[in-house]
Curated annotation (Swiss-Prot):
Active site positions, chain numbering: S64
Residues binding Mn(2+) 2: D14, S64, D440, H441
Family matches, as Gene3D superfamilies: Alkaline Phosphatase, subunit A, BPG-independent phosphoglycerate mutase, domain B
Name of the protein in question: 2,3-bisphosphoglycerate-independent phosphoglycerate mutase
A GO CC annotation given for this chain: cytosol
Amino acid sequence: MTTTPKPLVLMILDGFGHSDSPESNAVYAAKKPVLDRLWATVPNGLISGSGMDVGLPDGQMGNSEVGHMNLGAGRVVYQDFTRVTKAIRDGEFFENPTICAAVDKAVAAGKAVHFMGLLSDGGVHSHQDHLIAMAELAFKRGAEKIYLHAFLDGRDTPPKSAASSIELLDATFQALGKGRIASLIGRYYAMDRDNRWDRVAQAYNLIVDGKGEINAATAQEGLEAAYARGESDEFVKATSIGEPVKVEDGDAVVFMNFRADRARELSRVFVEDGFKEFERARQPKVQYVGLTQYAESIPAPAAFAPGSLENVLGDYLAKNGKTQLRIAETEKYAHVTFFFSGGREEPFPGEERILIPSPKVATYDLQPEMSAPEVTDRIVEAIENQRYDVIVVNYANGDMVGHSGVFEAAVKAVECLDTCVGRIVEALEKVGGEALITADHGNVEQMADESTGQAHTAHTTEPVPFIYVGKRDLKVREGGVLADVAPTMLKLLGLEKPAEMTGTSILV
């Protein structure tokens, strides 16, 4: 077996995107002879770090947690919102075994299918498109009685914006010819997370026994009456719609929120036999399903169970007897360890970690170099002593100084990074090692909002650089994403990628 160059260094320049526009672009403005030389002379290109390419909704800017998860996993790691949306688009949602089992059992017994959740397009806890899909699933599987218990938003959406969402679901039921909205209540009651059980009790009694403070003929009338009482969406009081509906033994109940924290309390009331927070008038025996896992302690199946990431890069390197070093300063240490390892806290066998403290300043524009020089000292030392097969480093400057919105400081941050990259490349050349230079998402390449002229402190959807430093004659293919980086590293290391890694090498 031929020996591969050692070490292979993955440099993650956090928040270092690429923009063709020179406007407010700290990367463009900075004096960066090393990166300019690499860009002109070695294999390089751009890869995507945002939207569906990293498991987020279309057009959504990337972030450090998601970026490092994708970089280390070697596959697109879909977030819960996106997992559900993608399953609906692909048609898989309508065959989901957990939901279908609950619905089919209820249908076979002539029972009702109830589903509940936050009815809005906020996309933080739920999405109305998911509720529409649930209505369609119940209809397709033969349910005659389909009831939506709608929780109104007004926090992740404007305070009085529920009318359009109600209209959408009313239209869905009308088109299906089956089903209706059975109740309305504000999320203040149904989605408490502070153990205010008096609020949760009102939601539970409304859903299970149809007991509302108010009854309205239609959901729209119920909403209008709430507004007339001075309530905004979040605080709409328990309102039963039409003939009050009850949840009976044998019914299916599906909670359609994908975010866990505000779904736990109401779920507990439905499924805990020894529940003691308030006295339930009834606890019907239902087929209860959560869209995701709300807590391990809640005895209910999840339609989209948490995916455990097997054979992430760190794990696979360990299985193949490779040594690795993870290094970052405080601000990004969790990203280069926990998130890069697919949500695992403990180091893998043969993995060592170095944490360099971030400087104690109020904001990093006051010290744009942060602790990058100290991080670089330790990497150069590790390269020279040849102890590790792989070194993964995060440089926090582009992101943390980018968030300050101070252009001059961001330029200094990029210039500092250029010096650090130069030192690492020089050390690698001495020992015959290799490097990949990339980023997790954009930020520092846009420091002002073009429309307002104000400081731009957020991430961007710009692509990020991908640079190969080494002696092999390789080319960078187009269309790469963050999930392709780990398979690229395995190719350089002479290792077959595991089946779980669906990314493909960027170097060809």
